Amino acid sequence: MPIKRGEIYLFIGFGAEKFSPKMLSKKDRRKLKKYPNLANQNSFKLSRYLKFRAKKRGKICLSHKENIAVLAISKEKVGVDVEELKERNFDGVIKFCFSKKESEIYASAKDKMQKFYEIYTAKEAVIKAKNLAFSNLANVKFDEMERRYLIINNLFIICLAFKHCKDIIVKFL
């Protein structure tokens, strides 16, 4: 079924055991030749498995961590980011990439960890949707695009950033 305008397909995968090198695109095979250590990385295998299984045409955006990968596909520009929800020292990241307003929102939040990840994943998703470099993180506002969050088992947060969306279709693979 083709993707319609206003739809975002979000594919989520947790296990790389179904991955096979036969699933790789020509581009990914060249990448693997250049960086052979990628073959040992769970996040690489998992994200490539999602790309293979999705088989949808449109604009794609990919994000992955060690034990999860997410792939967003849409007719319009879309950005996605996934992060593991875990305590860490957020101060350095906040100083580097949060605006004054974002820092104030974080500081006044009841659940600081969740608020940090909501802002941070939104900024990364916006960067991806706008095809900007990571160095632009400080200049991007977390609320400059529409966004939706998905928290999975209190372990991961996923943020989608987009301009127009009527439906989000989530598939766990």
Per-segment meaning from a language model:
Residues 1-173:
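Core catalytic alpha/beta fold that binds nucleotide/phospho-ligands
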